[in-house]
Amino acid sequence: RICYNHQSTTPATTKSCGENSCYKKTWSDHRGTIIERGCGCPKVKQGIHLHCCQSDKCNN
């Protein structure tokens, strides 16, 4: 699986992953809205929005 692995507004980068899914986590703090992308489908704490998907580059 090929997943995006960049944060928020940094230039898009991808990674070839062993997992079959990609994720995109979104949350807000004093810096504003933070977006984190990567491989797999992690468990998240309350208040963090998580989107997991199962196709290449699906987590932008």
Curated annotation (Swiss-Prot):
PROSITE patterns: SNAKE_TOXIN (PS00272). SUPFAM superfamilies: Snake toxin-like. Disulfide bonds join 3-22, 17-39, 41-52, 53-58. Keywords: Acetylcholine receptor inhibiting toxin, Disulfide bond, Ion channel impairing toxin, Neurotoxin, Postsynaptic neurotoxin, Secreted, Toxin. One of its GO terms (molecular function) is toxin activity. GO terms for cellular component: extracellular region. Expressed by the venom gland. CDD domains: TFP_snake_toxin (cd00206). Pfam families: Toxin_cobra-type (PF21947). It is found in: Secreted. It comes from the Eukaryota. Coiled coil: none annotated. Belongs to the three-finger toxin family. Short-chain subfamily. Type I alpha-neurotoxin sub-subfamily. Binds to muscle nicotinic acetylcholine receptor (nAChR) and inhibit acetylcholine from binding to the receptor, thereby impairing neuromuscular transmission. This is Short neurotoxin 1.
